[in-house]
Amino acid sequence: MKGKWAAGISPRNFTWVIRDRFAVSERPGGFGTSHRKVRREEELLWLSAQGFDRIISVLMGPSNLPAYTAHELDWGHHPIAATGDRRLALRECYFDLDKALSSARKVLLHGDELGDRVMGVVAGYLFWSGRITQGPAAISAVEHLLERSMGPEGRTLVADSERPTPDATQ
């Protein structure tokens, strides 16, 4: 493939959380009735060309996981439910993300859309990891970064993001 599309296209709403290390976007290829396999392929080409080597999905189902494997992109799947006790899922997601970032990997985290759930997971991670020491400050930082307000679902995820104890292991 040559020309403008040779390196693919960036995923919709792609935004760096930690420049050149950790980014978020909507699900590669889109979601629901707007999902397109061709677009997913182009976006996965772009992610590979940009050096991403870990994708973390917080979708409830295994959508796109076989495509990540086909593109030789390492992935983690941590379903974050819309309701209920999500603390264990958040903890597993945060440990995965922290391990990848500590290993100098380039990580993309996504949900179906870049909305409350992804915003809450990102703000929760920033708080959980100690990068931002207060939950409300993490919420404010993510709202500023993504240029949108976080609703109740996202704020609840931040509240559920318990800081690990110094001796915590997975």
Where are these regions (language model features)?
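Cys-dependent protein tyrosine phosphatase-like superfamily
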Residues: 1-108, 121-170
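Glycine-rich nucleophile elbow surrounding the catalytic serine of serine-hydrolase chemistry
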Residues: 115-121
